[in-house]
Amino acid sequence: FTPLHKVQVPSHDNESSRVLKLLTANILQTNESKYEFVSQMRELDPDFILMLEVDDKWAEAMLDLEPKYPYTVGQSLDNLYGILLLSKYPLHNSKIRHIVKEDIPSIDCEIEIEGKVLRFFGVHPEPPSPTEQPTSEDRDAELLRLASEIKNIKQTTIVAGDLNDVVWSKTSEVFVKESGLFDPRVGRGLFAKFNPKLPNIFR
């Protein structure tokens, strides 16, 4: 996970290549900067936005983006596990799943892009935490069940979200190996995001 290693997912600099931009944001449910977020999304202009910790107020604020992102799927909750996908492209067979717990939703859908269809999973499993879950058992179960399912999917598949894990953990290693997915961070960097108030070296 440093630039010294060969990249696992190559970059495409060819102008004829179709480039898609996916932005994932754990917005922090108590964050009140909803309209600043909307403004930032308009500026960044990703093709897809996956939002985590979405409650009803955040979901309502995102209606301002509907003209640009007419296709959505999600479930807003007030327990820090609401999830929402906004897309410029049509979504098909969209489902909200509860792989391990009824109050921990994930997204499973197909995205149609210029006649081609890819599979998308948006996830936010519960982390091990003294205040939430004393062990990583539920998180690990969700990720490994998903990996087992993905390995049999023939379509191009994307998994995005907040996995509440570090890339060097045994669970992360097994998830990548079992699913057959590639990690775009390999050869580029850790891109650690927590805590965003700290310098990168301390995350």
Tell me what each language-model feature is:
Residues L22-I27, F37-A61, F120-V123, E142-F175:
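Active-site beta-strand/loop signature of hydrolases that rely on acidic residues for catalysis
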Residues D45, K88-P90, K154, G180:
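Residue-level detector of structured alpha->beta connecting loops
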Residues S39-M41, L65-K68, D103, E137, ...:
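Glycine-rich, phosphate-binding/catalytic loops in enzymes
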Residues L20-L23, G82-L84, I107, Q155:
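Structural detector for hydrophobic anchor residues on beta-strands
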Residues L4-T24, S33-R42:
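Canonical alpha-helical transmembrane segment with a positive-inside/aromatic-interface signature
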Residues T2-H12, Q29, S33, F48-P127:
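Structured beta-strand-rich core segments of catalytic domains in phosphoester-bond hydrolases
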Residues P70-L85, D103, D165-R203:
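Active site of divalent-metal-dependent phosphoester/diester hydrolases
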Residues T24-T30, E126-E137, K197:
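Acidic/histidine-rich helix-loop elements
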